[in-house]
């Protein structure tokens, strides 16, 4: 059975395991409920829509396909469906970095800082030849960076607190603190 939940990223911290090794983890608060159930007969596919209230006026909804048909509208989806050691995928909106140059955005090397160079150390260089007389599509240039949907795969669940509905995931997950993320098991 597929496991899935919506959660709010609280931030990162360090915890210690039984072998006294330090683990960098991301804490996620998970409190969501089923808002719609789709079935094969009526809709042509089976899925469960889960919602989570971030503020009083803002509700996030996400549909997870291939979910259990035993769920009903209003059922709570908590962290108790996950187990320590589970591998999950985490999706969310990555951090936006604004307008960035080619060195940060695409990893260009830049020009040498010696041999007569005074300016343009981080310039992109030529953007095309004389003949086509236009810039070719897909040319890597400066522009807006980040702020797109990102999925981190095979992240390990290292701690579950059922009373507080908290989950600790090993490593970093997409988004800023307070962002809504989707957590689901690896197929």
Question: Model-derived features: where do they sit?
Answer:
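Extended basic (Lys/Arg/His-rich) segments that typically form rRNA-contacting surfaces
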Residues: 1-187
